[in-house]
Regions:
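Short, surface-exposed beta-strand/loop "edge" segments at domain boundaries and coil↔beta transitions
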Residues: 16-20, 49-53, 76-78, 103-107, ...
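Beta-strand-rich assembly/attachment modules of structural machines
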Residues: 1-130
Length: 375
């Protein structure tokens, strides 16, 4: 017996207040959620039908002011900010481009909430953190950004859980570092905290924008979801790129009077010839923090980058909505590429969904990071 068709609904909302303004019949939709990134949304809206134009879609999708929500069978699965629209008169279609709520914080700078643009010297202000848990730092970066007049888009922390990793960080006002960049840099540190901004319906039935911060990881570990090729795993790609590998990494810090601060991390047990690269963190003045960045960068480039993409069934266990970015998964494959058969652990780092314009067209593509020891 065929199940009930999956229903997608697309809502517009006011970015500042969060109030839903209308529902639009979008099609050719694709949206993605990424760990420690914003994720994207693309869709088209036909304007030739008077039943649609009466909703005044141009006003509903004003870039930088409008938000979008995606609801799947009554559950919010995506939300973000409309940044681009493009109308084409030839086919009377409006193309809409949006990015997750994290993208808003790419347009904000790490400055104290009391910063007065009319009378404050940037060189005299900073946002400091001394021996603070890194998960608290992530939450505070978002809170400080939203404490500025007109800067609150109602993203609230889901919890106050701590990671047990403390850090001392200072964000000078003169750096004008974006809040989004500060969050990503924090996550990229060795044992740095994962983060994602998602949404759910609150007790009053209205969407709630949530900042979830890992301790340090997000997601479900230890009891992985399982995808098997030929069953709930429809297809996969297996790209391996060794062009950027290195066994020795130089991390370059601030240039001071006595020269540039440099940290080096090396792995001599890869079985590969020595290769070298460098990464730049010219704003860093803390030697230990720079060493952490060097080790983190080395871990990312010490072996060929393998980022498989899995095309999975949305309607078979584990069904779409039962897993999220950060979760562990087990992949089972036996085919001409792995003729002996193999299974390996991965971590979900991206989920891209194409709902389809008709029933039965829903597609889900997962980007995963293989665990150590993957074939």
């Amino acid at each position: 017996v065929a199940g009930r068709p999956t229903r997608y609904t697309y809502y517009t909302a006011d970015l500042a207040t969060g109030v839903i303004t209308d529902e639009l019949p979008l099609y050719d939709v694709t949206f993605s959620t990424e760990l420690n990134e914003a994720g994207e949304f693309r869709a088209r809206l036909p304007l030739g039908d008077p039943r649609i134009t009466v909703h005044r879609p141009r006003e509903l999708t004003e870039p930088g002011r409008a938000a979008l929500y995606v609801e799947r069978d009554g559950v919010l699965v995506w939300g973000g900010v409309v940044w681009t629209v493009k109308y084409t008169s030839a086919d009377q279609h409006l193309e809409i481009g949006a990015a997750g709520f994290l993208s808003y914080f790419d347009h904000r700078r790490v400055l104290p909430a009391a910063f007065d643009p009319a009378g404050t010297d940037l060189a005299s202000v900073s946002v400091p953190f001394t021996d603070r848990d890194q998960s608290d730092i992530a939450r505070e970066l978002v809170a400080v950004a939203q404490a500025h007049p007109g800067g609150d888009i109602r993203v609230r922390p889901e919890s106050t859980a701590l990671s047990g990793v403390t850090r001392t960080l200072v964000y000078p006002g003169s750096d004008l570092k974006s809040t989004g960049e500060a969050l990503r840099e924090l996550a990229s540190l060795e044992d740095g905290p994962d983060f994602v901004i998602d949404m759910a319906y609150g007790s009053d039935g209205r969407p709630v924008r949530r900042l979830r911060v890992g301790t340090p990881q997000l997601g479900r570990q230890g009891t992985p979801h399982v995808w098997e090729y030929g069953a709930n795993l429809i297809g996969y790609t297996w790209p391996a790129d060794g062009a950027s590998t290195a066994t020795r990494v130089f991390a370059l810090g601030e240039q001071g009077e006595n020269g540039q601060l440099v940290a080096v991390a090396e792995d001599r047990d890869t079985g590969r010839p020595l290769t070298e690269t460098e990464v730049s963190y010219v704003h860093l003045t803390d030697a230990e923090l720079l060493r952490s960045q060097a080790r983190s960068a080395l871990a990312a480039v010490s072996a060929p980058v393998v980022l498989p993409e899995l095309t999975v069934r949305a309607d078979l266990e584990p069904v779409l909505g039962s897993y999220q970015v950060g979760d562990d998964a087990l992949v089972v494959i036996k085919d001409v590429f792995f003729p002996e058969g193999t299974q390996f652990g991965v971590r979900i780092t991206g989920i891209e969904v194409t709902p389809g314009n008709d029933a039965g067209e829903e597609q889900v593509q997962l980007t995963v990071t293989p665990a150590t020891g993957t074939p």
